[in-house]
Amino acid sequence: MNKKQLGAFLKVVYKGKDRPALTNILIDSIKGKTCLVGTNGVMLAAVFIDGLDEWVGHQIARIDLEASHKAMTSRVSDTFGANEVAEIMDNGRNVTTKFPDYMSLITPYLEGEPVGQAMMRFNADFFKVIQDLNGEDSLTVNLYGEAKPMVFKSERGIYIVMPMTLKKPGQAS
């Protein structure tokens, strides 16, 4: 990940103190690809990074990832990958909180087919964060129903944005 992508990933990771499990990043494997998983309860990102096998199941504290982000320059050659994760695992904080069971959320969308729907309400800022994180000019969104998450799949990762509830005509806000 370049500096912009790492900054976007940090926007997906929860920042407050009231939900400590969400302030960490899980190193995991999805369909045989190692990844960093972060969520803030509204968005979830699983960014594929090769070479993390020995740390699967471990977590990185947000503050350690922030320090790596601050240390990066905007040069093309300055990227965050397996070597930087190794550095954090060797020198970073020991995280012992339990990461949420995100797989129960994303499993239905790893193979399922999207469905057509008439309308969905969303916050475009969340899409911009995912677009920056994925590093491409456009996004393809898979929709699975009005009250289901919006799912973005690419070679770089799997990203989920939870829908906002639609207000029905005449419904009080």
Language-model segment annotations:
Residues 1-173:
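DNA polymerase processivity clamps
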